[in-house]
């Protein structure tokens, strides 16, 4: 793989181990954990009120900061729900978007306004998608505009306890768990033990280890793709073989860009990586290099680059493949509720 070009914001190196700097911040992590635990208990005790929607709610989230692959899981989940006769809608915070308040996302929307992931989900699924920092308000607006919806899928929001939920799916990349400490000494928003209380743990990636009690019940996931399409003109298609023997530039503004670079390299491509921050607001200048050489990117970045993408920019669409039995477990619990604790 050739030398990297671009601005790569990485997670703090001290999140990977329990070294001196992490130890220095550990007291703050203890405080963070105490406050988070107190908040959870207040919601459980009813001292902080939750909003209970008149439909089922499924939260797809994570306990660590950074990318874990939630967006493809949400798209997969919506497909499973529709196949089973449900009428899902999606809510999201809209990270990276400028919208204030609640906004309905349409497939022809602007990622700079609604966020890249909600726009991608609107295009992938065709179901109603609403964004808003206030998730209960976003869900209420969705149900008012689309009363046929009978299940809400929350893209992220596991820690947004004000929204009551019927099911929780945690998408976990063990490599992002780092030193297993809470913020700011580590990358966790909640302790690993929080995963004991979710309905399904979906493991994405082979790096790192999960605690044995979680690894035994986690279902595997991988992202698969079989070709490329033009960013500016999606009707243009080509296979990976078209790029073999040529230098390609991989552009990624996602949580874990190295995974994308490695996936392309595993396909036999000579990759020059161009990492950018997660949710990066791309401009034409970001793609103004190496004219004539292919520029490959994820779907999440393609929705932002389409208005100005050159003809040599290609999207690599992927779908989530999740271990057998996962959909059945979700649908069973959705229909009949969680088993007694």
Swiss-Prot record:
Pathway where it operates: Glycolipid biosynthesis; lipid IV(A) biosynthesis; lipid IV(A) from (3R)-3-hydroxytetradecanoyl-[acyl-carrier-protein] and UDP-N-acetyl-alpha-D-glucosamine: step 6/6
GO MF annotation: an example: tetraacyldisaccharide 4'-kinase activity
One GO BP annotation of this record: lipopolysaccharide core region biosynthetic process
A Gene Ontology cellular-component term: plasma membrane
Alphabetized InterPro entries for the sequence: LpxK (IPR003758), P-loop_NTPase (IPR027417)
Binding-site positions, ATP: 64-71
Catalytic activity: a lipid A disaccharide + ATP = a lipid IVA + ADP + H(+)
UniProt keyword terms in alphabetical order: ATP-binding, Kinase, Lipid A biosynthesis, Lipid biosynthesis, Lipid metabolism, Nucleotide-binding, Transferase
Zinc-finger as UniProt keyword: no
EC number, UniProt record: 2.7.1.130
Family indicated by similarity: Belongs to the LpxK family.
Biological role: Transfers the gamma-phosphate of ATP to the 4'-position of a tetraacyldisaccharide 1-phosphate intermediate (termed DS-1-P) to form tetraacyldisaccharide 1,4'-bis-phosphate (lipid IVA).
Name of the protein this chain belongs to: Tetraacyldisaccharide 4'-kinase
Organism of provenance: Azoarcus sp. (strain BH72)
Gene field: lpxK
């Amino acid at each position: 793989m050739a030398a990297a070009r671009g601005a790569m914001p990485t997670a703090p190196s001290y999140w990977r181990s329990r070294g001196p700097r992490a130890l220095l911040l550990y007291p703050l992590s203890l405080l963070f954990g105490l406050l988070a635990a107190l908040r959870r208990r207040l919601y459980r005790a009813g001292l902080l009120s939750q909003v209970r929607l008149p439909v089922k709610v499924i939260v797809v989230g994570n306990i660590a900061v950074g990318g874990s692959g939630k967006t493809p899981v949400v798209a997969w989940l919506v497909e499973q729900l529709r196949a089973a006769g449900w009428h899902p809608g999606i809510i999201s915070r809209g990270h990276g978007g400028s919208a204030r308040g609640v906004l309905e996302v349409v497939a022809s929307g602007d990622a700079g306004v609604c966020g890249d992931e909600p726009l991608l989900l609107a295009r992938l699924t065709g179901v109603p998608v609403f964004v808003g920092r206030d998730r209960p308000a976003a869900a209420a607006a969705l149900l008012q505009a689309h009363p046929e919806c009978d299940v809400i899928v929350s893209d992220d929001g596991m820690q947004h306890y004000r929204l009551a939920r019927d099911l929780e799916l945690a998408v976990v990349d063990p490599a992002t768990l780092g030193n297993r400490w809470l913020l700011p000494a580590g990358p966790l928003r909640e302790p690993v033990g929080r995963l004991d209380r979710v309905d399904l743990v979906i493991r994405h990636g082979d790096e790192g280890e999960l605690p044995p009690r979680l690894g035994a019940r986690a279902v595997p996931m991988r992202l698969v793709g079989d070709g490329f399409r033009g960013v500016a003109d999606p009707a243009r298609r080509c296979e990976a073989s078209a790029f073999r023997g040529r230098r390609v530039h991989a552009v990624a503004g996602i949580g874990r860009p190295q995974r994308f670079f490695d996936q392309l390299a595993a396909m036999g491509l000579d990759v020059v990586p161009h990492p950018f921050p997660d949710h990066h607001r791309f401009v034409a200048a970001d793609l103004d290099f190496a004219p004539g050489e292919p520029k490959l990117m994820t779907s999440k970045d393609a929705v932002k680059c389409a208005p100005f993408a050159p003809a040599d920019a290609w999207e690599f669409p992927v779908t989530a493949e999740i271990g057998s039995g996962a959909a059945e477990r979700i649908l069973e619990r959705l229909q009949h509720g969680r088993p007694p604790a």
